[in-house]
C-alpha cells in the first residue's frame, strides 16, 4: 500500500484526537472520544473493541454503536467466536497484521449475524489489531469499525494504521480502569454483606 499524503486540516484532526486520548479512562469516555474528531478521521457507526483479559485468558469484546442495533446482533458481535470476528481476524492476518477491509458479502459465509448486518446496510468493515509483546501469535487488542454503505479504501486503511497505537492505549486504559472499579465495588459489597451478617447473628465485629 502506497502512503497517501495527508491534508493539513486532516493532520490537525489527528493531532486533536491524539491529544484528547490521555483523558479517556472510562467506557463512556471512550465512546464520546470516538464521536468527535475521531469521526472525521475514521468515520464509523459501530466499533467492536477487543482486549486480552488475563483473568479469562482470552480476548473479550465490547461494542460501541451510535445507532440502534438488534440485541442479537450486539451479542453476536461481542463474541470472539462469531463468524464475523473470526473472518476479521483472518483478513487481518492475511494482510500481515496491517489494517484490512473485510467484506461481509465476499469474505463471510451467509449466517444469521452477517445477514442481519447486510440487511442493515453494512458490508465493509475496517479491522486492525496488535499482538501481545513477545507473543506474535497471541492477540493483545483487536478493533473493527463499520458504517452503512461504507467504501473503505487505502486512505482509510492508512488512517487506521496511523491511529491504532493511540486507540490501543486508550482502550487498554479503559479496560484496566473498569476492571479495577469493578473489583472495588465487589469488595465493598462483600464487606457490607459481611457486616450485615454479623449484625444479624449478634457476633461482634472485629
Predicted segments, located by residue:
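Signal-transmission/dimerization alpha-helices at domain junctions
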Residues: 150, 159-180
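Regulatory input/activation interfaces that engage signals or partners
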Residues: 3-9, 13-151, 155, 159, ...
Amino acid at each position: 500500500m502506497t502512503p497517501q499524503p495527508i491534508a493539513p486540516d486532516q493532520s490537525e484532526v489527528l493531532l486533536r484526537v491524539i491529544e484528547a486520548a490521555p483523558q479517556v479512562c472510562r467506557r463512556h469516555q471512550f465512546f464520546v472520544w470516538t464521536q468527535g474528531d475521531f469521526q472525521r478521521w475514521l468515520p464509523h457507526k459501530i466499533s467492536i473493541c477487543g482486549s486480552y483479559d488475563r483473568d479469562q485468558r482470552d480476548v473479550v469484546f465490547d461494542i460501541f454503536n451510535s445507532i440502534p442495533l438488534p440485541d442479537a446482533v450486539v451479542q453476536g458481535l461481542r463474541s470472539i467466536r462469531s463468524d464475523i470476528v473470526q473472518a476479521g481476524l483472518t483478513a487481518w492476518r492475511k494482510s500481515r497484521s496491517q489494517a484490512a477491509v473485510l467484506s461481509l458479502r465476499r469474505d463471510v459465509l451467509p449466517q444469521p449475524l452477517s445477514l442481519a448486518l447486510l440487511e442493515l446496510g453494512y458490508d465493509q468493515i475496517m479491522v486492525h489489531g496488535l499482538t501481545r509483546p513477545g507473543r506474535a501469535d497471541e492477540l493483545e487488542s483487536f478493533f473493527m469499525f463499520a458504517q452503512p454503505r461504507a467504501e473503505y479504501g487505502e486512505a482509510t486503511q492508512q488512517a487506521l494504521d496511523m491511529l491504532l497505537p493511540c486507540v490501543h492505549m486508550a482502550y487498554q486504559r479503559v479496560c484496566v480502569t473498569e476492571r479495577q472499579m469493578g473489583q472495588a465495588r465487589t469488595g465493598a459489597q462483600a464487606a457490607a454483606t459481611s457486616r450485615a451478617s454479623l449484625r444479624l447473628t449478634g457476633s461482634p465485629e472485629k
